[in-house]
Amino acid sequence: MRLRHKPYAMDRINEYSHIVIGNPEERAGNWKEVFGNEQPIHIEVGTGRGRFMYDMAKANPHINYIGIEKFTSVVVDALDKLIEEEVPNLKLINKDAEDLTVFFAKGEIDRVYLNFSDPWPKKRHTKRRLTYKTFLRNYEEVLVEGGEIHFKTDNQGLFEYSLMSMAEYGMLLTYLSLDLHNSDFEGNIMTEYEEKFSSKGHRIYRVEAKYRTEPMQ
């Protein structure tokens, strides 16, 4: 994805600091206070322009959502949507997900979404994949016991790698689809990329993986 510089982006983000939360590390352990309720919290790592989080939050007002996106010129598009129609159970973070364990306390998050992440196909970039073991460890750190990852992609190579990585980490694969849009899965909410790729005939892969509460035998 080619990113277009938007000189107004930081000013816009700073103006709406109640939506794009600045200094999220200062909120660790207190995110329910940010939302003002005790509802569960789901996060999306690499939220892009925010369509998925926006639609999820609208459809599920009983759940709080946080979209994490490191690119300022992208997250400002998600912000613009929320300026037009603010959704109280959705916040944004404009930071790198490598710092996830700094933003949230242990067990503060109930679910992690990974949608159409950069596949980083070259072997030397394996550690950058959002399903690499280091990231899986970070997700486990902030998730409740037995927390889940829901992962979608159109990239077969990344999907196969992710299944292997999750299995090697000891996670339970509780749902698997090799062709989501031709499956019996109900309630799928599409991302911008998902709509684009599926319209071109790309197959969409999906997995739900759960962290074990007891060590493998």
From Swiss-Prot:
The gene for this chain is trmB
In its UniProt entry, the species of origin is given as: Bacillus cereus (strain G9842)
- This chain belongs to the protein called tRNA (guanine-N(7)-)-methyltransferase
| Summary of the function given for this chain in its UniProt record | Catalyzes the formation of N(7)-methylguanine at position 46 (m7G46) in tRNA.
Short name of any one Pfam family annotated for the protein: Methyltransf_4
Q: Which PANTHER family match?
A: 3-DEOXY-D-MANNO-OCTULOSONIC-ACID TRANSFERASE/TRNA GUANINE-N 7 - -METHYLTRANSFERASE, PENTACOTRIPEPTIDE-REPEAT REGION OF PRORP DOMAIN-CONTAINING PROTEIN
Residues at the catalytic site: 118
EC category? transferase
Q: Which Gene3D superfamilies match?
A: Vaccinia Virus protein VP39
- What one GO molecular function would you report for this record? tRNA (guanine(46)-N7)-methyltransferase activity
Listed binding positions for substrate are: 122, 154, 191-194
Annotated Gene Ontology cellular component terms: tRNA methyltransferase complex
Tell me its EC number(s), please. Answer: 2.1.1.33
**What HAMAP family has UniProt attached to this entry?**
tRNA_methyltr_TrmB (MF_01057)
Assigned keywords, A-Z: Methyltransferase, S-adenosyl-L-methionine, Transferase, tRNA processing
Quote the catalytic activity from the record: guanosine(46) in tRNA + S-adenosyl-L-methionine = N(7)-methylguanosine(46) in tRNA + S-adenosyl-L-homocysteine
Where S-adenosyl-L-methionine binds, per the record, is at 44, 69, 96, 118
Q: In which pathway does it act?
A: tRNA modification; N(7)-methylguanine-tRNA biosynthesis
Q: Which NCBIfam families match?
A: PRK00121.2-2, tRNA (guanosine(46)-N7)-methyltransferase TrmB
CDD domains found in the cross-reference section = AdoMet_MTases
Tell me which family the UniProt entry assigns to this protein.
Belongs to the class I-like SAM-binding methyltransferase superfamily. TrmB family.
Does the entry feature the keyword tRNA processing, yes or no? yes
